[in-house]
C-alpha cells in the first residue's frame, strides 16, 4: 500500500509536468478560431512555436509570407500535416481531418491578424 501511494504521487507529478510542457496560447482569438487554436497548440506548437512564429524552434514560422494562401494552399497544408515530408513527420495519428481544417482556419486568421500582405495587396495599396 505504501508503494502504491508513492506510485500515485509519482505518476501524478509526471502528468502535471507533461501537461505544462506544451506551449500556451498567448493571444485571444475570436470564438470561431478557438478550436483551431486549441488543436494548433496540442499538435503543432511544440515545433512551430506558440504563436506560429517559429522563433527558437526547429520548424519554420507559419505566420510568414511563404505560407500565405497564394504560396501555400490550404490543401497543401492539409497534405503536409497528413503525409509529412523529409522535414516534418506525419501528424496523421494525432489530428483528425476536421481538426486540421480548424487549424488551417486559425492559421489564416493569424496571418491576417499579423497584417501579412500579399504582393497583390501591396500593389493595390500603392495605387491608391
Where are these regions (language model features)?
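Bacterial N-terminal signal peptides that target proteins for export
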Residues: 1-9
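Hydrophobic helical h-region of N-terminal Sec-dependent signal peptides
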Residues: 9-15
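Detector for the c-type heme attachment site
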Residues: 22, 47-53, 108
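Gly/Gly-Pro-rich "capping" loops immediately C-terminal to redox-active cysteine motifs
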Residues: 31-33, 37, 53-79
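A general structural signal marking secondary-structure boundaries and capping sites
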Residues: 51, 66, 85, 110-114
Amino acid at each position: 500500500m505504501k508503494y502504491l501511494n508513492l506510485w500515485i504521487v509519482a505518476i501524478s507529478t509526471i502528468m502535471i509536468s507533461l501537461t505544462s510542457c506544451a506551449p500556451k496560447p498567448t493571444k485571444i482569438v475570436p470564438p470561431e478560431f478557438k478550436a483551431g487554436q486549441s488543436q494548433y497548440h496540442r499538435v503543432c506548437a511544440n515545433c512551430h512555436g506558440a504563436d506560429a512564429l517559429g522563433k527558437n524552434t526547429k520548424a519554420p514560422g507559419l505566420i510568414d509570407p511563404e505560407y500565405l494562401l497564394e504560396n501555400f494552399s490550404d490543401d497543401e497544408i492539409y497534405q503536409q500535416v497528413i503525409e509529412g515530408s523529409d522535414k516534418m513527420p506525419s501528424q496523421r495519428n494525432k489530428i483528425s481531418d476536421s481538426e486540421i481544417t480548424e487549424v488551417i482556419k486559425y492559421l489564416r486568421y493569424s496571418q491576417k491578424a499579423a497584417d501579412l500582405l500579399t504582393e497583390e495587396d501591396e500593389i493595390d495599396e500603392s495605387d491608391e
